[in-house]
Amino acid sequence: MKKEDRFKPAADRVLEGINSGRMQGVYASSAALQEVIFWFYNRRLMAELVDAVNFLVHIENLEWVGLTPEICLNAALLMGEYDVGPFDAYHAATAILRDKTILSTEHIYDKIKGIERIDPIEIMEKP
């Protein structure tokens, strides 16, 4: 997450909720790690890359879900049906095969049948 990202306050609150155990049953696709790696690599931010990945993989109470053949097949189908990019498709396929819920500010997930998107901004606004 960029330091100046407008979603940083919401992300910080969500991460704190996961780390503290207040938010339970939270998982993330390992594709998110790949996405972060590509983002930093493409900008040649190698030192920041290691720090970011190290931070993410050590978040307490966060389950990392690996890419499986079933997730990859579902992602490919979602890409064709909903015209979403590979990473969005991996995240959506993971959610569909788990609990059909995704935590994201991206409205692209609203058009994917069977997924309920939870906006982290709304979580931030709750006491």
Question: For each predicted feature, which ranges?
Answer:
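Acidic, PIN/NYN-like endoribonuclease modules and their adjacent C-terminal/linker elements
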Residues: 59-64, 92-127
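Short, well-structured N-terminal submotif of metal-dependent ribonuclease cores
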Residues: 1-28, 40-54, 124-127
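Alpha-helix capping/helix-boundary segments
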Residues: 32, 71, 91, 108-109
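Acidic catalytic patch
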Residues: 3, 27-32, 60-80
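Alpha-helical solenoid repeat architecture
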Residues: 86-87
